[in-house]
Amino acid sequence: ILYSFTCLAQTNFEKHFTKKSLRIDFALSGNWDFQAAAIQQLREEPVWAGPVKNLIDPFGYGGYYINVYDKAGKELIYSRGFNTLFEEWRSTEQAKTETQSWTNSISIPYPKAPVIIEITARDKADMQFHLLLKQEIDPASIFIDRGKLKENRITKIQYNGDSSGKVDLVFLAEGYTADEQEKFVADAKRF
């Protein structure tokens, strides 16, 4: 029953978002006992490749969650669970004696109006999400990086429709030299 009510409360994409992305680069810092989060950079990107339906994640999966609220109405308009390597590192012996800071990125649909974002982390003791960061973001802010993106060569291997309703796989040519690009594409096609 809870799932059906959540589905009924889904957000209208066109009301709140454009088809661009807002990439949020943030640091997770801490050790075995504590963690904190801080935004490092905001970046406007030209495409939103995520869902335009089911913007509110009903499942609660992941060690972290991002929640996006419409500032004017305080309505939850986007949420997604995610995991990080920092979360894994916090469970190591090294984290008992050291504090580290790891950079992470998450993309949300680009808001049309000011929003409030929250990043929460699941506490292993009670399995509940607890607030790490809460910040207002104005999509018109001069502090959002809108610089030209680097031109990269992209080869589509298979295309089955708009990415908002599909799962995208990206193959990076790491380990291949510039002269081996044809081999890389052939290897990716074989996959």
Task: List each model region and its residues.
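Bacterial Sec-dependent N-terminal signal peptides
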Residues: 1-13
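N-terminal prosegments of processed precursors
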Residues: 10-104
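Short alpha-helical segments and helix-capping/turn motifs at coil-helix boundaries
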Residues: 48-53, 101-104, 113-115, 152-156, ...
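Exposed beta-strand and adjacent loop surfaces of beta-rich binding modules
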Residues: 61-65, 114-116, 166
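Edge beta-strands of extracellular beta-sandwich domains
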Residues: 79, 124-141
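Short, aromatic- and glycine-rich surface loops/edge beta-strands on solvent-exposed regions
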Residues: 104-107, 111-125
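Fold-level signature of zinc-dependent metallopeptidase catalytic domains
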Residues: 141-191
